[in-house]
Amino acid sequence: IMAGLVGSEMCIRDRAWGQKVSGKISDKDYENVISKSCPGPGACGGMYTANTMASAIEAMGLSLPYNSSNPAISIDKSEEKLKISSSIINLIKNDIKPLDILTKKSIENAVKLITVLGGSTNAVLHILAICKTANIDFSIDDFQRISNCTPFLADLKPSGKFLMEDLH
């Protein structure tokens, strides 16, 4: 989702709720933020679960390059349809399935990217479930091993100041 704005300030629903319950903004101001905070289709702009997992899936090789950071309403996203459709046809013709692409190395790449981006902690559960389904030996200790030697580089919301659209 592209950033929602109230004036020139980006809308943050969670922050607005805190301001409302503490009496810093009125019910009307809160409703204004809510009505503008999600102005279109796509995942929330911060590094929450959806963007974290989209990034991880891209790093695993299960989506096209730049697919995860491309805003849903961008011209580039619209143009991706052609690349995606030809890729799907190629995968079907060559009988390539996700389990043919997923490897321990691709999972490690995903965890490195999650760490670099400061991704959602929900990714641990999702990645472990993917590994179990794919019969890839991977544990929470592997997350720790990888994160110990991988820097956190992104300043993305909710803790930072940038959005997924800025990464694209």
Place the predicted regions along the sequence by residue.
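Accessory "access/gating" subregions that flank catalytic or transport cores
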Residues: P39-Y48, S55-E58, L62-S120, L125-D166
